[in-house]
């Protein structure tokens, strides 16, 4: 979707049903402002990108079994209305560039998806997800993305999992037409 079309739809209520499925009614106007701000920041960072895709991935609360999933146990989780949103433009430059609000931009070359000893954080997550899609036979050619999150890191509502879900959703929806289950995707990305 063109940036101006996205902004017009947000302003004129064209996405209100989508916002109503994600957020509480009293939060829709503030969320619309949040999305508009994210698109503006994306445009400032990547001024030559005009076709965008916008994604949301929720945080989660673990009701039972907290952290047992890290040892292949089971957990009962529920989504919360805090999320990370991403504005992305896909391209054929064979690189993923991501700028998250409050953090420096980083890049992951799709020509180098091997494990990097000592690499930690978001670039490690993105590299692992891209490697998993490659292992599944999905051709990825790259994208630029701006993210903003109200899922606070270290708060116990899975900010890293929300970021991972956001990236996997963007890749899966654009390059793979959504056929992969998240369980199938995320477990092997932990390398």
Predicted region positions:
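Conserved small/polar residues in nucleotide/adenosyl-binding loops
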Residues: 183-189
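ATP-binding N-lobe of GHMP and related small-molecule kinases
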Residues: 2-161, 165-180
């Amino acid at each position: 979707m063109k940036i101006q079309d996205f902004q017009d739809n947000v302003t004129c209520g064209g996405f209100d049903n989508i916002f109503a499925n994600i957020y509480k009614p009293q939060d829709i106007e503030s969320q619309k402002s949040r999305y508009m701000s994210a698109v503006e920041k994306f445009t400032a960072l990547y001024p030559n990108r005009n076709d965008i895709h916008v994604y949301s991935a929720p945080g989660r609360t673990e009701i039972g079994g907290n952290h047992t999933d890290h040892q292949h146990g089971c957990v009962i989780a529920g989504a919360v209305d805090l999320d990370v949103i991403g504005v992305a433009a896909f391209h054929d430059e064979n690189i993923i560039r991501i700028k998250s609000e409050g953090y420096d931009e980083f890049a992951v070359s799709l020509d180098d998806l091997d494990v990097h000893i000592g690499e930690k954080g978001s670039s490690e997550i993105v590299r692992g997800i891209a490697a998993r899609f490659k292992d599944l036979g999905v051709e990825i050619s790259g994208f630029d993305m701006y993210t903003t999150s109200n899922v606070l890191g270290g708060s116990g509502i899975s900010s890293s999992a929300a970021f991972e879900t956001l990236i996997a959703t963007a890749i899966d929806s654009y390059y793979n037409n959504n056929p992969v289950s998240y369980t199938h995707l995320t477990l092997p990305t932990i390398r």
